Amino acid sequence: MSCILSVETSTDVCSVAVSQDGACIFEREDHSGPNHAVKLGVYVDEALSFVDSHLIPLDGVAVSCGPGSYTGLRIGVSMAKGVCYGRSVKLISVPTLELLCVPVLLSEQIQEEDALLCPMLDARRMEVYAQLFDRSLKEIRPIQADVVDHETYKSYLDEHPVYFFGNGAEKCLETINHPNAHLIKGVEPLAKNMFPLAEKRMMNEQFEDVAYFVPFYLKDFVAKSPKKLL
């Protein structure tokens, strides 16, 4: 097994964690808002000081690669690449929507064998970034930017119980309005949940090119005009 530093900045939550042999040995989280530019460097420095003080060699850095916040992803990936350069370790990317599934599966809330998981990240209005998986994390439908109405997932809901979660899910459930639609609240993409996915990629040598890797934004960045002009 390996020692992996994990970085997650795809939403307003900033989190950093370290795993050794698959167990979390260090974690830091900030839920106060999009403070990645302020918090992330501090948390990463603390994590690296922790592994150094315990004489634990770092084997890789895992980073949530998107989709999600354009600015957050850019900050997280830049930090991860910097550590990889500085420490000469491997870079591992973990898809954000797949990461969201980990705490749901670990909680064992889903009992139906044919259940589907639908992690959602809020985009804007009734739009979400969403993907569908079965309970083994096999992809059933690829990532899409969905403008949600009552027909969006109907073909899946007519055949399966579907569990929706993530920061885009709650606003959609009333619109989806189907007896097979279930909401799981409080699920966030966190660095401490990245380890099972990162370890698997480490074992399979699924590494990214540190020089050329970029986040998966799904959609182009759209700049917002300020509400007030000075």
Regions found by a protein language model. Give the residues of each.
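DPxDG-like acidic metal-binding loop motif
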Residues: 62-96
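Stable alpha-helical structural segments in soluble proteins, enriched in small hydrophobic residues
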Residues: 47-51, 86, 104, 191-202
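Surface "functional belts" at beta-alpha junctions
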Residues: 23, 35, 90-189, 217, ...
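N-terminal beta-alpha supersecondary unit
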Residues: 1-65
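Acyltransferase
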Residues: 140, 184-230
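Residues at secondary-structure transition points
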Residues: 31-39, 70, 74, 78, ...
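Phosphate-handling active-site elements
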Residues: 51-58, 85-94, 110-112
